[in-house]
């Protein structure tokens, strides 16, 4: 079985890890009407490692993979612990994935079901990635690809930082970085615009982990906890574009049903019968504007 899975594992290609773009939705004229994971209908912005403040790197590592800079792509103790939990549950309830494995999953298996063979393939590719790339490169690729909330405008660290705080990644503070790191475990449930209490508790958990791993002092932790999450957020959500969000949601759901793929995870071009001018007019009327 192991030999079979190894043969079936995709060939590692570092170029495939690049977040070169996002799924794009086109209107009836063939014009771009919506770009997933971007701000103001632009292209998804990728950051470099030099753009990342140390406080963000520390928060992400503390939250997702405390031995990230030490292991070779997968963490054996975590894998063993996860395997025991899965055996006890009688199902694959958790994978103990490292940051490198998460990057591989997002790239090679974005919509795949949890299976032991897929997990094995994930580990093989993660080890290959760790040999081919530096830790800094892996972390940067990961942060450019992952999503941080419910909105399509929170995919990738640059878009998420703009969406929540309306600032550049390099300007992130400790409490902001901890909040973003905390969302990765469950972006849907830790989106502060929808689940403020959950997001606050999770952020504080990450701050505690940062103390545990020696990244910050207890005083720095306490000071960061005193900053209310609601006071860090933009006064209003920065939307992707002026297109009718309901229409985008309907089309997105239809794409998922027809293809079994999620445009948030798998890059694709989506062509619709939407008349953008009509949609803009409807949105204006809905906002009470005079036509």
Where are these regions (language model features)?
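Alpha-helical membrane-targeting segments
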Residues: 8, 72-91, 116-120, 124-127, ...
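Extracellular/periplasmic catalytic domains that process cell-envelope and extracellular macromolecules
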Residues: 16-19, 25-27, 51-55, 132-134, ...
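N-terminal post-signal-peptidase region of extra-cytosolic proteins
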Residues: 6-12, 40-49, 63, 123-124
């Amino acid at each position: 079985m192991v030999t079979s899975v190894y043969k079936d594992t995709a060939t590692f290609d570092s170029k495939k890890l690049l977040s070169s773009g996002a799924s794009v939705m086109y209107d009836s004229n063939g014009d771009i009407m919506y770009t997933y994971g971007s701000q103001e209908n632009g292209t998804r912005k990728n950051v470099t490692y030099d753009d990342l403040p140390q406080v963000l790197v520390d928060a992400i590592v503390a939250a997702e993979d405390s031995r990230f800079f030490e292991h070779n792509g997968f963490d054996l103790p975590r894998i063993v612990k996860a395997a025991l939990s899965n055996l006890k549950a009688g199902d694959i309830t958790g994978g103990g994935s490292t940051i490198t494995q998460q990057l591989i999953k997002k790239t090679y298996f974005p919509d795949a079901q949890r299976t032991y063979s897929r997990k094995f393939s994930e580990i093989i590719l993660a080890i290959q990635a760790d040999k081919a790339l530096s830790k800094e490169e892996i972390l940067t690729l990961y942060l450019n690809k992952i999503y941080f909330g419910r909105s399509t405008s929170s995919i990738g660290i640059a878009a998420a930082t703009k969406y929540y705080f309306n600032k550049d990644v390099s300007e992130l503070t400790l409490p902001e970085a901890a909040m973003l790191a905390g969302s990765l475990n469950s972006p849907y449930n830790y989106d502060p615009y929808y689940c403020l209490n959950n997001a606050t508790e999770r952020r504080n958990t990450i701050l505690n982990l940062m103390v545990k791993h020696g990244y910050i002092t207890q005083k720095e932790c306490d000071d960061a906890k005193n900053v209310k999450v609601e006071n860090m957020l933009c006064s209003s959500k920065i939307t992707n574009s002026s297109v009718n969000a309901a229409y985008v949601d309907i089309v997105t759901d239809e794409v998922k049903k027809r293809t079994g793929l999620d445009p948030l995870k798998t890059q694709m071009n989506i062509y619709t019968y939407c008349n953008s001018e009509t949609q803009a007019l409807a949105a204006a009327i809905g906002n009470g504007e005079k036509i």
